[in-house]
A protein has these predicted regions:
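Activation segment/activation loop of eukaryotic-type protein kinase catalytic domains
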Residues: 1-23
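Conserved end of the kinase activation segment
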Residues: 29-41, 55
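A conserved short alpha-helix in the C-terminal lobe
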Residues: 43-53
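C-terminal lobe substrate-recognition/regulatory segment of protein kinase catalytic domains
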Residues: 79-130
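Terminal C-lobe "cap" of eukaryotic-type protein kinase domains
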Residues: 119-126, 133-154
Length: 154
């Protein structure tokens, strides 16, 4: 699950390379070239792994390229929250997304729950997922907050 080949110590305010992480687990901040990312990037990846386990899909977001990866995320997470995230931080979508990123509604997690995976999807797990897979990196749970989540009290 971990590739230490690109590991670095984190220093707040430092700009990092966005060409890190395995594509299907990349947080949206990497896909829009936000170079001042932080630990919250790892929590997005944890959410991707959790979703794969819960919904028995590998991976949840399966883009064919970095550009397609953000489109796959938007097809599930919706476009509206992505646009709010961009506006909040004064970010622009890279040019390669022009004409490709449509107005996708957010899909509820219930669309991914079936009889065969229901036993892996208690409400606490769905709530944890909902707080990890968040466009806005500052609104995602931290690792400490995630460990205090009711899911881990089951």
């Amino acid at each position: 699950l971990i590739d230490w080949g690109l590991a670095e110590f984190y220093h707040a305010g430092v700009e990092y390379n966005v060409r890190v992480a395995s594509r299907h687990y990349k947080g949206p901040e990497l896909l829009i070239n936000l170079r001042q990312y932080d630990y919250s990037l790892d929590l997005w990846s944890v959410g991707c792994v959790l979703a794969s386990i819960m919904f028995a899909v590998e991976p949840l977001f399966k883009g064919d390229s970095n550009t397609d990866q953000l489109i796959k995320i938007a097809q599930i997470m919706g476009t509206e929250d992505l646009m709010q995230y961009l506006r909040k931080y004064g970010l622009l979508l890279p040019d390669e997304y022009k004409g490709l990123l449509k107005n996708f509604p957010r899909k509820p997690w219930s669309k991914f729950i079936s009889e065969s995976n229901l036993f892996k999807c208690p409400p606490q797990a769905v709530d944890l997922l909902d707080n990890l897979l968040v466009y806005d990196h500052q609104k995602r749970l931290t690792a400490a907050e995630a460990l205090e989540h009711p899911f881990f009290k089951l």
